[in-house]
Structure formats: structure tokens, C-alpha cells
């Protein structure tokens, strides 16, 4: 992901800052040598050049030679100064543009972050996140995501699961018509139930997800357009992570992987390192991974790898999702996992 920059100390910068004074130095050395060696040059000329003008007819002083050389050198020096001025102006314009981009990104980021914090602190948002994390996802003793909702092998209809304010039987009628009458796999049933649980609280925290999605989309767009350098990009992602509790990180992760509404957010999360890196996953640095449903391979796509492969994947998936204009094709997408697995 790293890019070569024209910074002070780099070979590119040294070439630009070194070549002009070097040329000027060489020119002045040439003038000095010509003035110093003028008599010797006359003797050499008289001894070695045939069909020459008589040396006696050459009557030129050092001062006159200096005037001639200066008249030749002056345009060269003027050109060099002009080119140096253009280089300085270009550098100043680039620095000014970079500063403007940085200021614009800073204003937008903190403006959106302020809106996000307001949604985050609403009581209904807090209650919804608590339900999703403690009951829908991580209830070790109940019908929860990490327990596969206690679905038996077979038709798997005989189990309960929690909605936001109620306890429901799993029923095939909850699913869209394309699943009716089909024997769904255990994994498909788990994905359908967790998606239904998120749908049940969506109206209470839709703005929370939308603003968070917008923050990531804005940062990614600026980074892709080189309006934000890698260091600033990582810094903003780090700041964003610090605003989230471990419970929120898990809820955002499950929403991005398993809920169809979270497909766009899942794509924007690719290559951000919001959830941490491989070392963080091994020690549950930022959150406890909901095992065994979530494995490290599920998280690897969100890592900011040094080669930038995941960033490229994000761009490709953004284009792929944008190119889908067939409603039936879009409806066939179950969630982020099914969307990216289609390219595997």
C-alpha cells in the first residue's frame, strides 16, 4: 500500500534540489578556466590549428571574453532560475492542495463522527446493541448464534429464538418465498435467524449503521482518490475504532457478514483494519470473536495487508455491487459472505 513520495531526503527530492546549483557551479568554473587559460589557449591555437587566422590579428582581452561569456551564460542562468521558480510554485501548490484535502477530510470526519456519537448514545440504540450482543449472538445457555440456535440435524424447525421483545418459534414461513418447501442447511437456517434478529431492531438503530457506513465510505473514497495519505487514513480508522465498544465491534461484524442490509458496509470494511490484524485476532485484542461461528478466515478480508490486495478487493466488490441492476440477481445475494464467496 505504501507509495513513493517526493519528500525531503528522497532521491527524487535530492535530484531536484541538487541539479540547478550544480549546473551554475559548472558554468562559473568554465568561465574561470577560460579567463585563466586564455593566453595558453592562444599559444595552443597558434601551434596546432592549420589554415587559421593569424594570432596577431586576434586582439581580444580577458574583459571582452568575459563579456561574451556572460552574454551567453545570462540566458542560461535566467532559464534555470525560471525553472526553479516553477518547481517551487508547483511544490507550494501541491502542499496547499494537500493541506486543503486534509482540512476537508478532517471537517467531514469529525462532523459525521459527531452525528454517529449522538445515535450511539441514544437509549434505544444502546438497548438494541445489548440485545444483539448478549442474547442474539452470545447467549451461551440459550438459542443463540454461537450455539447454532440449537438447531438439530434434519428439518430443524423445533427450536425457539429471541426477537427484540419476544420469543419466537423458527418457521419456514419467516423466510422469503424462494426458501419455502426447501430443506435448508443448518448454516442457512442460522444465517436466516441472525438476519431476522437484526431486522427486528433495525428501525431502532438504522441511523447508527447508515452514519457509520457513510464515515467509512468517505474515508475510502478520499484514500482511493489520493486525497488522503495512508498515514492519515490509518489514523482516522484508529480514531473510529476507539469510539466503539467491544460489543459494538461484534455487532458491526455480524451485521456485515450475515445481514443483507449490511452488505455495503461489509464491502467498505474490507482492508480497513477496523477489527484489528491477525495478531489482534489471536488474542482477542479488541473483542471476543464469536466462536465457533466466526473463524479467523472470516476476518482476514478486513485486514489492511501490506500488499494492498484487500484494498483492491474492496474496489472490485464496489464495482461489482454497483453493476448489479437485475432485481432477481440482487435478491439471490443472501449476505456479504455469499457475495464474496461467489468469486472464490
UniProtKB/Swiss-Prot annotation:
InterPro entries: PutAbiC. It comes from the Bacteria. Pfam families: putAbiC. Keywords: Plasmid. Provides resistance to bacteriophage by abortive infection. This is Abortive phage resistance protein AbiC. It comes from Lactococcus lactis subsp. lactis (Streptococcus lactis). The gene is abiC.
Amino acid at each position: 500500500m505504501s507509495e513513493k513520495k517526493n519528500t525531503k531526503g528522497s532521491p527524487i527530492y535530492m535530484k531536484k534540489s541538487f541539479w540547478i546549483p550544480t549546473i551554475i557551479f559548472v558554468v562559473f568554473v568554465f568561465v574561470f578556466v577560460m579567463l585563466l587559460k586564455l593566453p595558453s589557449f592562444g599559444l595552443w591555437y597558434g601551434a596546432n590549428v592549420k589554415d587559421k587566422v593569424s594570432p596577431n590579428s586576434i586582439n581580444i582581452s580577458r574583459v571582452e571574453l568575459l563579456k561574451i561569456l556572460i552574454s551567453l551564460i545570462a540566458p542560461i542562468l535566467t532559464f534555470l532560475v525560471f525553472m526553479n521558480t516553477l518547481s517551487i510554485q508547483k511544490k507550494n501548490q501541491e502542499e496547499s492542495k494537500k493541506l486543503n484535502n486534509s482540512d476537508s477530510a478532517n471537517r467531514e470526519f469529525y462532523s459525521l463522527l459527531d452525528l454517529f456519537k449522538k445515535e450511539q448514545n441514544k437509549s434505544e440504540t444502546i438497548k438494541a446493541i445489548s440485545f444483539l450482543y448478549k442474547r442474539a449472538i452470545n447467549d451461551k445457555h440459550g438459542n443463540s448464534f454461537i450455539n447454532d440456535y440449537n438447531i438439530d440435524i434434519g428439518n430443524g424447525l423445533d427450536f425457539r429464538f429471541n426477537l427484540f421483545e419476544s420469543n419466537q418459534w423458527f418457521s419456514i414461513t419467516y423466510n422469503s418465498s424462494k426458501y419455502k418447501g426447501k430443506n435448508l442447511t443448518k448454516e442457512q437456517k442460522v444465517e436466516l435467524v441472525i438476519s431476522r434478529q437484526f431486522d427486528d431492531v433495525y428501525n431502532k438503530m438504522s441511523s447508527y449503521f447508515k452514519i457509520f457506513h457513510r464515515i467509512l465510505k468517505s474515508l475510502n473514497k478520499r484514500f482511493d482518490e489520493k486525497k488522503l495519505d495512508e498515514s492519515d487514513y490509518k489514523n482516522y480508522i484508529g480514531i473510529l475504532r476507539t469510539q466503539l465498544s467491544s460489543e459494538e465491534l461484534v455487532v458491526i461484524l455480524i451485521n456485515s457478514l450475515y445481514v443483507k442490509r449490511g452488505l455495503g458496509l461489509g464491502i467498505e470494511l474490507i482492508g480497513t483494519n477496523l477489527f484489528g490484524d491477525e495478531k489482534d485476532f489471536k488474542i482477542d485484542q479488541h473483542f471476543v470473536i464469536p466462536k465457533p461461528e466466526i473463524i479467523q478466515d472470516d476476518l482476514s478480508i478486513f485486514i489492511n495487508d501490506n500488499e494492498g490486495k484487500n484494498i483492491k478487493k474492496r474496489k472490485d466488490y464496489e464495482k461489482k455491487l454497483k453493476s448489479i441492476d437485475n432485481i432477481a440477481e440482487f435478491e439471490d445475494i443472501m449476505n456479504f459472505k455469499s457475495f464474496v464467496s461467489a468469486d472464490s
